[in-house]
Amino acid sequence: MGKIIGIDLGTTNSCVAIMDGNTTRVIENSEGARTTPSIIAYQEDGEILVGASAKRQAVTNPRNTIYAAKRLIGRKFDEKEVQKDIDLMPYTISRADNGDAWVEVRGQKLAPPQISAEVLRKMKKTAEDYLGEPVTEAVITVPAYFNDAQRQATKDAGRIAGLEVKRIINEPTAAALAFGLDKTDKGDRKIAVYDLGGGTFDVSIIEIADVDGEKQFEVLSTNGDTFLGGEDFDQRIIDYIITEFKKEQGVDLAKDVLALQRLKEAAEKAKIELSNSAQTDINLPYITADASGPKHLNIKLTRSKLESLVEDLIERTIAPCRTAIKDAGVSVSDIDDVILVGGMTRMPKVQEKVKEFFGKDPRKDVNPDEAVAVGAAVQGQVLSGDRKDVLLLDVTPLSLGIETLGGVMTKMITKNTTIPTKFAQTFSTADDNQPAVTIKVFQGEREMASGNKMLGEFNLEGIPPAARGVPQIEVAFDIDANGILNVSAKDKASGKENKITIKANSGLSEDEIQKMVKDAELNAADDKKKLELVQARNQGEAAVHSVKKSLGEHGDKLDAGEKTAIESAVKDLEEALKGEDKDAIDAKTTALMTASQKLGEKMYADAQAAGGPEAAAAAAAGAAGASAGAAAADDNVVDAEVKEVKKD
């Protein structure tokens, strides 16, 4: 069985890790980085770019470059958080037929799970390249405060990417696994995980206990905000720059999509720089132009100004911390360690606020960008049976219940209940001779059902005629270890039963998922063809270069017919290289190698006469350069021109 990889599917950046024995390894991607930007770009020719390459071209292709898709996953178009993002994002967010928030790219509508699947596919490929074997199974992390619809949508993204998602695990819990695994302290420890990422905030209170030599990680409580993160901090900087520029130049950059994309990059860069310095310059020449000519932007931003811009955002993280402490039944003084997760926790003001609330310095020995992926890899090892000394007890973040008479939310499973769990309760009818009941399932903490998130509904029909209150209808809730809910209803008298696995009352249908899986497979096949074409082209170009060089140096040794044949073969290959036909390029490369054999023989003979066997061997190697280039295909060696451009 192959390894189960751990993936941190982040709003801003993603990361993949594996367990190698008892050692964790975060895997570098093809660009050599340990994290990959969660950015996807759709090119005019149909090519899909993921990660750093997508980020690099965002300024010139803002409408077709998707970032922060995780903020939309499992959400309805009408939700206020989505409506807020519509005004901020350069790409188009539209309503799908099922009411979900989807994204429009180059004339087609894409579901957020479909977009996130591109990032997951990149993570999968990164792991496969490192392991040298196919990867089909993964543990994927989600914010602890993700609801059922968002968790289901994340699983769908995994399926579309060709992964069997063995477990959905909460990000703070994964970070706790990464932190606690190598700690040798005896006795129980209570830790707080403060996770402020690119798009979401979570806090979890977790107890790590030694139980008969086994490390038990029990989540006592969790809380958070799934629409608060680094993207919001960036937006505050962008808004500030727009306001200042309008004051100075009288031009509103908010209406210029290309300028906004440059501002986003500059804001993120400034935010990162201000974690280490007191002041930074935001310098964007030719940001826009009007009738008077081009306009340049140059603004100084100090750390104190940034802190004043985002003060309320940082403050918003404290209320969930307070609630999590209360729900866990502990006091702040009971917390032994505070762990910071997510890139935003590098901001000094955030660290200061966390210290102020918890009364102690947060730990510095956890990598905020990598801990979540490492914890997911640990859980993968547990699920594969390769690790027996870890037990993870997670919780459901929000209460689950059904709507009863008068629109009341009757809670079946309360928040912070350890999962997996089951609960059943008996209900009855509201009217005489009622033949059916509709079970509406909600998630949330409000007393009235309408104030909570509706997850789904189904009917139980065929109830025998009886006075109101007489029929006995048992409703059962069953939450699995992924936090995904199954609900059933059964009439005890007739034995009639109905059940559903709760997806969003919209979500992706099975047919839609299967279509997306097929599309993804076609894309993978297309990518493979493109790679093979590039390899063939590289080898063809190497052959042309090698033969032309040798012809220039030794062509006078050939008779006219031989030289003409080689020149003709070179011309044919150069013509083939202009096209997209890999087979034609391969054939012309082979033809050139055959035609240039005489040239190789002449070079060998000349060298042997001049300097003996060693020189002859070197000459032969030079003449055979084209052949070697073609043979390299078998060894998966690709010649490529690489040019590094460094920006100040």
Swiss-Prot record:
GO terms for molecular function: ATP binding; ATP-dependent protein folding chaperone; unfolded protein binding. Keywords: ATP-binding, Chaperone, Nucleotide-binding, Phosphoprotein, Stress response. Signal peptide: none annotated. InterPro entries: ATPase_NBD (IPR043129), Chaperone_DnaK (IPR012725), Heat_shock_70_CS (IPR018181), HSP70_C_sf (IPR029048), HSP70_peptide-bd_sf (IPR029047), Hsp_70_fam (IPR013126). The keyword Nucleotide-binding applies. NCBIfam families: PRK00290.1, PRK05183.1, prok_dnaK. This is Chaperone protein DnaK.
